[in-house]
């Protein structure tokens, strides 16, 4: 089986199912049973269970990197066993560039072509960031007995309501036939916490996650937030974590710019957000830094 562009179908799979038992294998086995030629790419299966904001971060950048036609099967399903149903949506995407506005490298594959992608997820906010960043063309409730069991296993909706229908879609089942079309206000979103501008030149945000296993500290302050304040590489920043841990350092393009091993560095993560690290060492672990703590940035 090939898609209309001549490639084998692709499912990129993210879950909170972990890697210590056969749960992920069951989902993949079901995908392969429905769509034997599918290529399954693991995104992540060790996200914090039920944390839709963390999951949303892992799936928002993928259309810039995956071939058109990819189906993104993404799930954390705390409402398993209820009347909840998944949502499937199509996005169109034509974009170049990563965090710094262009790809590092000149290979032909780095210029993204225009194409469409399908996301399938619980309707619990997991697609909030995807919709904000990419918009969507159409969205449907996943309810047709042609793509989900009439009596789904009540404790395993990630398999029954995400993995199974994603395989049908990868195999060519029409998106518009998975269920009724959803109005925009029927798609659940979580409230995003954007950075706040204080006193015209200070930014206040928070730590979104620790970049394991390196111990780098990622924030919700985007490159564009910094650019509005005239910040570029070399601009001196005073950054305070959790109100008590100060750093004074310039924004740098690489870890090596910190100089000696263990020195602190402020940089843009691969996703385009302000981050803090130590050169070839962990910043988060010695200070026991966690997601959710405050970040204050003063320029100059």
Swiss-Prot record:
Claim: Zinc is one of the keywords in the record: no
pH dependence: Optimum pH is 6.5.
Assembly description: Homohexamer.
Keyword Nucleus: no
PANTHER family reported for this sequence: CHLORINASE MJ1651
Family recorded in the similarity comment: Belongs to the SAM hydrolase / SAM-dependent halogenase family.
EC number(s) per entry: 2.5.1.63, 2.5.1.94
UniProt-annotated binding residues for S-adenosyl-L-methionine: 16, 21-23, 77, 158, 211, 216, 270-271, 278-280
A GO term, aspect molecular function: adenosyl-fluoride synthase activity
Source organism phylogeny: Bacteria, Bacillati, Actinomycetota, Actinomycetes, Mycobacteriales
Species the sequence originates in: Nocardia brasiliensis (strain ATCC 700358 / HUJEG-1)
Superkingdom, natural source: Bacteria
Annotated control of activity: Activity is severely inhibited by 1 mM Cu(2+) or Zn(2+).
Keywords, in A-Z order: S-adenosyl-L-methionine, Transferase
Described function: Catalyzes the formation of a C-F bond by combining S-adenosyl-L-methionine (SAM) and fluoride to generate 5'-fluoro-5'-deoxyadenosine (5'-FDA) and L-methionine. Probably involved in fluoroacetate (FAc) and 4-fluorothreonine (4-FT) biosynthesis. In vitro, can also catalyze the conversion of chloride and SAM to 5'-chloro-5'-deoxyadenosine (5'-CIDA) and L-methionine in the presence of L-amino acid oxidase.
InterPro entries per record: Fluorinase (IPR030978), SAM_HAT_C (IPR046470), SAM_HAT_N (IPR046469), SAM_OH_AdoTrfase (IPR002747), SAM_OH_AdoTrfase_C_sf (IPR023227), SAM_OH_AdoTrfase_N_sf (IPR023228)
UniProt protein name: Fluorinase
Reactions this protein catalyses: fluoride + S-adenosyl-L-methionine = 5'-deoxy-5'-fluoroadenosine + L-methionine; chloride + S-adenosyl-L-methionine = 5'-chloro-5'-deoxyadenosine + L-methionine
């Amino acid at each position: 089986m090939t898609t209309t562009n001549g490639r084998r179908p692709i499912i990129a799979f993210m879950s909170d199912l972990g890697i210590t038992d056969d749960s992920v294998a069951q989902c993949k086995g079901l995908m392969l049973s429905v769509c034997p030629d599918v290529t399954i790419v693991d995104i992540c299966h060790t996200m914090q269970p039920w944390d839709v904001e963390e999951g949303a971060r892992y799936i928002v950048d993928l259309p810039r990197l995956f071939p058109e036609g990819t189906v993104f099967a993404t799930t954390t399903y705390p409402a398993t066993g209820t009347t909840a149903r998944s949502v499937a949506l199509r996005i169109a995407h034509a974009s170049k560039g990563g965090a710094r506005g262009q790809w590092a490298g000149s290979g032909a594959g780095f210029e993204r072509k225009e194409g469409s992608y399908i996301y399938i997820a619980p309707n619990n906010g997991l697609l909030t960031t995807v919709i904000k960043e990419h918009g969507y063309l159409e969205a449907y409730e996943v309810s047709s007995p042609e793509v989900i069991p009439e009596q789904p296993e009540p404790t395993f909706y990630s398999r029954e309501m995400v993995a199974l229908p994603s395989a049908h879609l990868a195999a060519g089942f029409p998106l518009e036939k998975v269920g009724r079309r959803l109005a925009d206000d029927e798609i659940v979103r979580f409230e995003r916490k954007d950075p706040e501008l204080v006193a015209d030149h200070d930014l206040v945000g928070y730590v979104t996650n620790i970049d394991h296993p390196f111990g780098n500290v990622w924030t919700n302050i985007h490159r564009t937030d910094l650019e509005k304040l005239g910040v570029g590489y070399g601009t001196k920043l005073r950054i305070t974590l959790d109100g008590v841990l100060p750093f004074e350092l310039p924004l740098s393009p690489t870890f090596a710019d910190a100089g000696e091993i263990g020195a602190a560095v402020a940089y843009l993560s691969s996703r385009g957000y302000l981050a803090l690290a130590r050169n070839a060492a962990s910043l988060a672990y010695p200070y026991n830094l966690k997601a959710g703590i405050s970040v204050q940035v003063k320029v100059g």
